[in-house]
A protein has these predicted regions:
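Right-handed parallel beta-helix
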Residues: 1-67, 76-83, 96, 144-171
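Short, surface-exposed interaction patches in beta-rich subdomains
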Residues: 68, 79-171
Length: 171
């Protein structure tokens, strides 16, 4: 049985920190909204993860999900060792994704900030499309805006108006 949990908080002082331990189970949906403050999520299993923040960085690590939808207005995004389709719509801040493999769909749109994707495994079934109005693009050490491997059933679309885009192998 999948669970949904709703928890609301409101603070008027600065530098408040909330830590919410959750039981080890698979959640149907996790939604996190914040006006101000950094959000860190780790070691969670959920079908759907949705994170919105007006001002603050978002960090997601070791999270298994079918779909991850992250929308910060002002702040960086860092995703490490997590699985599932990723949608990021960021107005200002860098985006960094470190994955073991690129076997999910990615749609990352960044108005102002760089996008950096690193993977340990060579992609075998992926199409990458990257565009930057003001910045450089490097995909696996080549100055190109496109990459194709295998049947291309998985897609990665990377866009930034102002910033560099890098997709590379990591150690």
């Amino acid at each position: 049985k999948k669970s949904n949990v709703n928890i609301g908080f409101s603070f008027s002082k600065e530098k408040n920190r909330i830590r919410i331990p959750v039981p080890k189970q698979i959640f149907g949906k996790i939604e996190i909204e914040s006006e101000l403050g950094d959000i860190t999520l780790g070691a969670v299993q959920t079908d759907s993860l949705s994170v919105f923040t007006e001002t603050g960085s978002v960090t997601v690590r070791e999270t298994q999900t079918k779909k991850m939808d992250i929308k910060p207005e002002l702040g960086s995004v860092k995703i490490t060792r997590s699985t599932g389709d990723i949608i990021i719509d960021n107005e200002m801040g860098n985006v960094e994704v470190a994955a073991d493999s690129l076997d999910h769909n990615f749609n990352i749109n960044n108005e102002m900030g760089s996008i950096h994707i690193s993977t340990k495994k060579e992609p075998s079934d992926l199409f990458i499309s990257a565009s930057s109005e003001m910045g450089s693009i490097r995909i696996f050490d080549k100055k190109t805006g496109a990459f194709r491997a295998g049947d291309q059933t998985k897609e990665m679309e990377l866009k930034t108006e102002m910033g560099n885009i890098t997709v590379e192998h990591s150690n």
